[in-house]
Curated annotation (Swiss-Prot):
InterPro entries: GHMP_kinase_C_dom, GHMP_kinase_C_sf, GHMP_kinase_N_dom, GHMP_knse_ATP-bd_CS, Homoserine_kinase, Ribosomal_Su5_D2-typ_SF, Ribsml_uS5_D2-typ_fold_subgr. It comes from Clostridium botulinum (strain Kyoto / Type A2). The lineage of its organism: Bacteria, Bacillati, Bacillota, Clostridia, Eubacteriales. It is found in: Cytoplasm. Belongs to the GHMP kinase family. Homoserine kinase subfamily. This is Homoserine kinase. GO terms for cellular component: cytoplasm. One of its GO terms (molecular function) is homoserine kinase activity.
Length: 297
């Protein structure tokens, strides 16, 4: 049996639209074994127990590339990453499927080949890269090749995810974005993306509040998330370092000083006054990324 663990990811990190992402310590686990025949799923809803399951789709892509034909498969999922909340649940399924398939087939593909294959299936290197590699990454796609670099994050920072009880599909969140942008808005984001990376790298955490600002996606998507601005304002009042929409949303991610012991309790009290229910989870950066059979990929 192959066991694969994949972390949740938070993409964009404010201005780094479709390029920055960070892995955090929420995980999906996948247990896969080859059986005599058939396709058996455990741990997911009945509507996902078929060949359209994203994990299986990813596995098949890997098997086809390698030229391996399993006799049958049993796939068990232990999922802790909330679905359609902007925490990389799709990326985790794709990465988990591809890595487990490669392992079953004898580990034919190297890490670079696995990464390119996963991005080809999932389409978002800002989620796939940190899910694979752990930590924070800056990623681009160049002629279908995935190029990335790890971003060093100084000690002394933690994250807090505010996860609502409602979902938001990536497709819907993409649909509200404009077809084109002003030149000045592009410059606005380029500068703040550079500032974000530098501030995290050098431990200049007081600059994060400036770096979190964005003009490419967050304001458009905020309209789909009830109380987004009031929550953001409350987080800022509670001395957060920065607030941003996690991926396409609706999860709101907050950066905090590691020694901050009061934020979670105070923001939870505020969220309880709102109509929707919100879960508050303090998180750390996952530095390992994907782990297969207790070893790093």
């Amino acid at each position: 049996m192959v066991e694969v663990r994949v972390p949740a990811t938070s993409a964009n990190i404010g201005p780094g639209f479709d390029c920055l992402g960070v892995a955090v310590n929420i995980y999906n686990k996948f247990f896969v074994e080859e059986i005599e025949e058939g396709l058996i799923f455990e741990g997911c809803a009945d509507k996902f127990k078929n060949e359209n399951n994203l994990i299986y789709v990813a596995m098949k892509k890997c098997f086809d590339k390698i030229g391996y034909k399993p006799t049958g498969l049993r796939i068990k999922i232990e999922s802790d990453i909330p679905v359609s909340r902007g925490l990389g649940s799709s990326a985790a399924c794709v990465v988990g499927g591809i890595v487990s398939a490669n392992e079953l087939a004898g580990g034919v593909l190297n890490k670079k080949e696995l990464l390119d294959l996963a991005v080809g299936v999932e389409g978002h290197p800002d989620n796939v890269n940190p899910a694979f590699c752990g930590g924070m990454t800056a990623s681009i796609s160049d002629n279908r090749e995935v190029i990335y670099s790890k971003v060093k994050v100084s000690e002394g920072i933690k994250f807090c995810a505010l996860i609502p009880d409602f979902t938001l599909s990536t497709e819907k969140a993409r649909a509200v974005l404009p077809k084109s942008i002003d030149y000045k808005d592009g410059i606005f984001n380029v500068g703040r993306t550079a500032l974000m990376i530098s501030a995290l790298n050098n431990g200049d955490f007081h600059l994060i509040k400036y770096a979190c600002k964005d003009k490419l996606h967050q304001d458009y998507r905020a309209k789909l998330i009830e109380n987004f601005y009031s929550i953001k304002e409350e987080c800022e009042k509670l001395n957060s370092l920065g607030v941003f929409l996690s991926g396409a949303g609706p999860t709101i991610m907050v950066m905090l000083k590691e020694e901050d012991k009061r934020f979670s309790k105070n923001i939870k009290s505020f969220l309880e006054t709102l109509k929707n229910k919100w879960e508050v989870r303090e998180l750390k950066i996952d530095k390992l990324g994907t782990v297969v059979n207790n070893r790093k990929v």
